[in-house]
Amino acid sequence: MTERFDCHHCNESLYGKKYILKEENPHCVACFEELYANTCEECGTPIGCDCKDLSYKDRHWHEGCFHCSRCGSSLVDKPFAAKEEQLLCTDCYSNEYSSKCQECKKTIMPGTRKMEYKGSSWHETCFTCQRCQQPIGTKSFIPKENQNFCVPCYEKQYALQCVQCKKPITTGGVTYRDQPWHRECFVCTACKKQLSGQRFTARDEFPYCLTCFCDLYAKKCAGCTNPISGLGGTKYISFEERQWHNDCFNCKKCSLSLVGRGFLTERDDILCPDCGKDI
């Protein structure tokens, strides 16, 4: 007696017929397609065993159904793009969705390297310095009046030059007497300490920190011998070519403050009227 060889699903004999194994179980073609064949995204019918099954992201198409959703051209063996679940040939995708190069106005094709800045796009080779025309690529650049410049060209054409070192000022900087300086170049004439953000004064148009200015040029208090800066509202008394801090203008004997009072002098000393009675 001949051993039976039937379809695992419908039990029809498979002798002399085409069949397909699924998990080592034989199936007739009809049962296999009904149970296991993928459904075409386009026409909604099963993709039979005698058809090529084209897939993209777990979706399947008959070879004849795999075409552009806009123009209908076949996408078999051609590059394509997906947009909102629809497949598009590169021409249709570019016409509808690809950005245009700000410089040459041509489409920037999918997969092409591009540069983006402030909502505009360029081909990588079109994003160039306005002055030297070299591609900027990933290098730093500076925008100026709707034009882009590489840093060296911008410095040559637009940057202010520091009055001290004569080099371009690219960021920050300070202005003193209507002249531009690098922050690191604007220093005290005496000690070379940076003055940016600090209180300073000047003599003969040269800037000085307060400490150096007082040490070099300020009058000395006749009482404590420390400099009288005269800056920041500092009050002092001047008498016969001598100066005192307000706090130092006191009677030599009793230390009474003489600010706003009468006083007497005894050689280099100043005295209140009471202490000066015995003179």
Curated annotation (Swiss-Prot):
Residues 40-92, 101-153, 162-212, 221-275 form the LIM zinc-binding domain. Gene3D superfamilies: Cysteine Rich Protein. SMART domains: LIM. One of its GO terms (cellular component) is nucleus. One of its GO terms (biological process) is atrial cardiac muscle cell development. Keywords: Cytoplasm, Isopeptide bond, LIM domain, Metal-binding, Nucleus, Phosphoprotein, Repeat, Transcription, Transcription regulation, Ubl conjugation, Zinc, Zinc-finger. GO terms for molecular function: bHLH transcription factor binding; identical protein binding; transcription corepressor activity; transcription factor binding; zinc ion binding. InterPro entries: LIM_FHL1/2/3/5_N, Znf_LIM. A zinc finger (C4-type) spans 7-31. The keyword Repeat applies. Expressed in heart only (at protein level). The keyword Nucleus applies. Its main location: cytoplasm. It comes from the Eukaryota. There is a cross-link at K78, K167, K220 (Glycyl lysine isopeptide (Lys-Gly) (interchain with G-Cter in SUMO2)). The modification Phosphoserine is found at S238. It is found in: Cytoplasm; Nucleus; Cytoplasm, Myofibril, Sarcomere, Z line. The third LIM zinc-binding mediates interaction with E4F1. May function as a molecular transmitter linking various signaling pathways to transcriptional regulation. Negatively regulates the transcriptional repressor E4F1 and may function in cell growth. Inhibits the transcriptional activity of FOXO1 and its apoptotic function by enhancing the interaction of FOXO1 with SIRT1 and FOXO1 deacetylation. Negatively regulates the calcineurin/NFAT signaling pathway in cardiomyocytes. Interacts with ZNF638 and TTN/titin. Interacts with E4F1. Interacts with GRB7. Interacts with SIRT1 and FOXO1. Interacts with CEFIP and calcineurin. Interacts with FOXK1. This is Four and a half LIM domains protein 2. It comes from Rattus norvegicus (Rat).
